[in-house]
Amino acid sequence: MIIEVRAKNCYAFEDDITFSMKADMRNKKFGANVHKENNFNVLKTVGIYGPNNAGKTCLIKCIRAIRNVLLNKKNGLMPNIFTDSDVCELGVTFMASGRKFSYDFKYDAEKEEYIYESFSEIFKYKYNNEKEVCWLKKDTVSEIYECIDESVQTMISVVSKNNLLCYVVDTSKFEHINEMKQILVGFAEKIDIINMNNIPMQHTIELMKNKNQLQQKVVGFIKNADLYMDNFEYVDMDRIQLKTGEGVEKPDEKVLDIPENIMDQIRLVSTYKGVHVPSMMFDSTGTKKIAAIASYVIEALEQGRILVVDELDSSIHFKLTRAIVAMFNNELNTSAQMIFTVHDINLMDCKRMFRKEQIWFVHKDEDGVYVYSLADFTAQQGVRDTTDVMEKYRKGALGALPDPELINSLLSIKGGVKGDDANAK
């Protein structure tokens, strides 16, 4: 599970930002929303709010970059366009098998080199104090090289910088570096990242092809979403009923269209009053998105995965988004985690759904981009457990709110008045 993400000079983030999923155990409210293991307390869900183009998606890009780096894939990292530095800095603290680890790296995007990386294990002891034990530190700028495997330490300075250390040495020969690689790769492989505006149906299709318990749970999820649907199946073509002239058409939504697998899409059918119809052609965009996300949600809950969702509320009714989040917050969920961006303030509910530290904001102004939690606001600032957070956010008291002036556009279109002239009047 992710405990903390750190970034500097990455995408929209020029200065240091820290996104934390550490639970504040002074707050006893909604204890089921917290995963507790070996005296570590981690939030099961976090929702991120903010205006368009503020940096919410950039935060998800940082998580994706961390995952891709750890899996030896193209990282896609870009330094902030307003800085002179080419060095992107990223870090993550996470739990794996009941242990807490921290990993940080610096990547020179111009030279395509990893100029710094460090890996540590964090132990908790008396009075909740923590102790960090360094397994690896490679700082090519300051020429500091440390490794728990002494035989590795002598070679760190001469190995290539075009990749992480665990991918440029034969880790099978070194006990701790090999374990480090397994921990990092195992963590990264558990992260699924999806965008609800461009979510692939193929993941659900592949699960629907296999008649097993996981497939049955995906179908149950879709049916329980209250879509007036009798069943949802992957069937043979002869069971699909099409009216004359309809033929095999592509779905309207390009975001859900997979041309090379169009027949797979057609065989994914919904049943209404005993009639089988191709879901991709007949169902609403929202229904298709629910079907697409169903496989990710079920797999996350079944296998203890980390599901990161951009624009969770896209084309989905607010009651369904609440229900999906509630599945992860439930006490029956013992290992899965969900991080999501959202605009729907109906989810901003600290009275019935969330702890304060589960609601985060991304705010942008002329000076930069800021990432902060609702828990950063004190009672003296007017935010208490009994506060109507939705109303506070509507009024702009929490920041991270757009301030559109579209009336100027209307006046310029309909009245022949330019925006600046309209303001002057």
Positions of predicted regions on the chain:
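P-loop NTPase motor core
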Residues: D84-I148, V362, L374-T387, E391
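Electropositive, glycine-dotted interaction segments
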Residues: K106-K243
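Pre-Walker A-like glycine/lysine-rich segment at the N-terminus of P-loop NTPase domains
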Residues: M1-A65
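Short alpha-helix of the ABC ATPase nucleotide-binding domain corresponding to the H-loop/switch region
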Residues: H317-R322
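C-terminal lobe/lid and adjacent interdomain/linker elements of RecA-like ASCE P-loop ATPase modules
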Residues: M1-E4, Q303, A323-K425
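Extended helical coiled-coil dimerization/tether regions that scaffold
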Residues: K8, I199-F282, P402-D403, N408-K425
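Conserved ABC ATPase signature
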Residues: T45-G50, E249-I298, I306, L312-I316
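Conserved P-loop NTP-binding catalytic core
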Residues: N39-G47, P51, I60-E112
